[in-house]
């Protein structure tokens, strides 16, 4: 899909969910600075593919390489280069957004100070919810807590995002699109699913799973 040397390479992937084969023979390469959008109807395996590319799920067949090395050989090192945000962020309902964000960063080994976390949460639209317990947040607000990690300048080369624009207003969509574009401009890689159009600096390459479905 990209002609320059790939950072992420996958060959002949197959995905089985229950007794249903979602896709097979799926190959892709993503070069430094590229953004890849995974498209396709619901039920075609978009989230499953993201989890496979992150090493969080095993493919039925095929191989994934990061910078030329199979991720299966050293998942721990691979995960240190990865920032994955699923569609349902795991939050502790007893903690505030700020506490949840700081906990997530610490768990991932990222050293981020409190002021930076506050700034990120304000930027994503949670200024009025900083001190509220997560249990009272809406689903959209819960997602924003997870997305705030993208505004912290964390040095992770590969960002994998499942529907990051859901429940964001137009200003937040534009701000997030700029952040993703900036990450790619700095040589990072973004792989995402989204049903929304976003004002990216460069339109992403699209992989449509309906074209490779089993």
Swiss-Prot record:
The lineage of its organism: Bacteria, Pseudomonadati, Pseudomonadota, Betaproteobacteria, Rhodocyclales. It is found in: Cell inner membrane. Pfam families: ABC_tran. The gene is ccmA. It is a peripheral membrane protein. The keyword Transport applies. It is an enzyme of class 7 (translocase). It comes from Aromatoleum aromaticum (strain DSM 19018 / LMG 30748 / EbN1). GO terms for biological process: cytochrome complex assembly. Transmembrane segments: none annotated. One of its GO terms (molecular function) is ATP binding. Residues 8-212 form the ABC transporter domain. ATP binds at residues 40-47. Belongs to the ABC transporter superfamily. CcmA exporter (TC 3.A.1.107) family. One of its GO terms (cellular component) is plasma membrane. Its EC number is 7.6.2.5. This is Cytochrome c biogenesis ATP-binding export protein CcmA. Part of the ABC transporter complex CcmAB involved in the biogenesis of c-type cytochromes; once thought to export heme, this seems not to be the case, but its exact role is uncertain. Responsible for energy coupling to the transport system.
